[in-house]
């Protein structure tokens, strides 16, 4: 199996993709940790990567809410004693649920498996909560139900977070995530058009397929640890196809850091989205576009609480 299991001992396990580590995922980790303590055991979260749907339906690329390494760190921060990553491949897909659970030994002595009633794993998704209870009755561990978490009357899911982002509803996405939606990319060379217009932007390329918000202009926060930028440097973020100049259908993410003058090429930026200022639109002239960009910056500074040096923390308090 494409999973390395260290010597953990007695444990309660939960498993999934955990994309975004939204509030429902956090509840799952908390339930697992409580169940583990009650059984004098460790809590273990097993992360499947890539998302199973990418293997089950070749050619599918999941729009991810977090880079892979941040998923693992946030699962740990939520309270899991151990975080294991299982590479989901064709072999793992064909494992029956009882085979997968048995393969956790000898490193893990199962005391429980925590799952939501609608989740499943293993070949043909046979590993339902009911099936795990049957396996546990024979093998000597418990099936632990994690009740779905409802926000505004609806279950929280990564799909729901993506839908909020696709609608440009950053506030709802943030409520579901309990943190600002973000993406991470590397600064690449663009056509320098922003610099020519007086708004030098950092153009981002991604090593994964990020879940992008709706096309538009956003107020955001940027961190560039290697350049001592941030961790909450205010910025305007454009997600769009630049229709004033051309519309080739390729969505670009461009970041304009307020009160920043420096070279960020090849740097890795983490960009948090705070609020959508406006939708993307085509302007009749470059001059009209520049006027709007100035208005966008003025609006951003107003929300931040004035001029140069304004703290991004102010925006976080307001939103």
What annotation goes with each model-predicted range?
Residues 4-67:
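N-terminal catalytic cores of NTP/NDP-binding nucleotidyl/phosphoryl-transfer enzymes
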Residues 91-200, 284-292, 297, 310-318:
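Classical nucleotidyltransferase
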